A protein has these predicted regions:
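The feature primarily captures lumenal catalytic ectodomains
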Residues: 1-238
Length: 238
């Protein structure tokens, strides 16, 4: 561990409120927030897991979380099968990937906030998914948060693994359960958010791309295409 940013915290996680029923909650413990300097791990930019010396390191929100992405092919609650072959050796890098790195929600909520701690390291190379080349707004969001003149942006393919001689890695600032091993299990410990990081992220993006705050819309509708998860009234809104 290179540096502890925040200590372990506790908070109450509430389930969805139902009529005529008491709103249940569960007290959760958030792991401390740390910056790690790791030598010679094997990474895949589409996985939040780190592989080193035959072991997988992954911060689960609960034991029912499924995280077989990137080079993690299969796992249960104890063991995992991982692809440990790598395509390239990288000298040094700040890890800006993770489960769902191609997904705007995970990218915005879980991955981008880590740029706010980039200056806590001396690393000048950022490792990020090459998906930002396909989605201009993803790249623009990154540009709003860092000064590209000071850093080298190394784009990594999700289908490839890499060995990094010195990896700077931040554990989860904000965490959302990626998927479930057993979808029938309904649990309350499915995520947490550190709101101060989200506020800082929001302010940086607004200051970069919105000149007149008075012109901001109160509500924003996200148009989803090429997916089955489309709002029923989408055509009416468009």
């Amino acid at each position: 561990k290179l540096k502890e940013i925040e200590p372990q915290l506790k908070f109450n996680s509430f389930e969805q409120k139902s009529l005529n029923q008491e709103n249940k909650f569960k007290t959760l413990t958030i792991p401390s927030l740390n910056i790690f300097s790791i030598e010679n791990p094997i990474i895949n930019i589409n996985s939040s897991a780190i592989v080193k010396n035959g072991k997988i390191y992954y911060e689960r929100i609960n034991t029912n979380e499924r995280f077989n992405e990137g080079n993690i092919k299969y796992h249960n609650k104890t063991y995992a099968v991982a692809d440990i072959f790598f395509d390239e050796i990288i000298e040094e890098g700040f890890f800006l990937g993770g489960n769902g790195c191609w997904n705007w929600y995970h990218y915005l909520i879980e991955i981008l906030p880590k740029t706010l701690l980039l200056e806590e390291t001396n690393c000048k190379t950022i490792l990020i998914s090459d998906d930002i080349s396909n989605y201009p707004t993803m790249k623009q969001a990154l540009e709003a948060l860092i000064n590209e003149k000071h850093y080298t942006i190394k784009l990594l393919n999700r289908k490839q693994n890499f060995k990094v001689k010195k990896l700077f890695f931040i554990n989860e600032i904000n965490k959302i359960e990626f998927n479930k091993l057993d979808s029938n299990i309904k649990n309350l410990d499915t995520g947490y958010h550190r709101e101060n990081y989200l506020y800082n992220l929001r302010n940086k993006l607004i200051n970069k791309y919105i000149e007149d705050n008075k012109s901001q819309e109160k509500k924003i509708f996200l148009w989803r295409e090429n997916t089955h998860k489309i709002a029923k009234n989408q055509n009416d809104i468009l």
